[in-house]
Amino acid sequence: MENILTKKFTNGIYDHINIDDYHADREYLSSSSIKEAIKSLKHFRHYLDNNNNERKSHFDFGNAFELALMDVMNNTAEFDNEVLVFDETERPEVDKNFNSTLNKEWKAEIMDTKKYIINKVGLESVETMKLMLESCWQDETIQGLLKNTDYQKSLFWTDKETGLNLKTRPDVCKVNKCVVIDIKTCKDASPSGFGKDAANLNYPIQAVLQMRGCLETGLMSVINKYYW
């Protein structure tokens, strides 16, 4: 599904902007494009020319989990508004996989939405998400960090040294405490497992951009703590 930019952004702090508008913007560079530039300028150019925000199930699952987690912590209802739950067992031809024409058309209709799409059961599903939420709710540290926070502020600014227009979208900001939190979902949350993910996926690049965005836009005067 193609994203069409419906809002023109300028430097500043934005609340509750549409995620598709955020990603469709090409005037400002995000950490995703910077990660490609680290590989090479050819990777960077290819990303800018060909990035069509192809839907990936693990991105949908991660974003949907963030919404569910923040709903639990802050008594909101963003998950119901932003997430579509479907059941693969309800496909027209249950005895066939999604290579069949009917099943393929059925799934294509479901995918034609701006909402995050999550399966009812399976590995990346509502079933899995409920277990993760129960674990988080029982953790006092997580509760302390996530309750009464601002979720997904979008920050746009121009870097003074390079003149580049940059953007970032921290998951959680505790503005009064000058704390930034980026929620990550992973299969192995052990220190070594997460460390490998952080290195392989360049999490520090994203973290630096999030902290810099908070400072440059004036959202925070200092960053006291940053959490993954």
Segment roles from a protein language model:
Residues 1-167:
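Metal-dependent nuclease catalytic cores that hydrolyze phosphodiester bonds in DNA/RNA
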Residues 147, 153-228:
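Mg2+/Mn2+-dependent nuclease catalytic core
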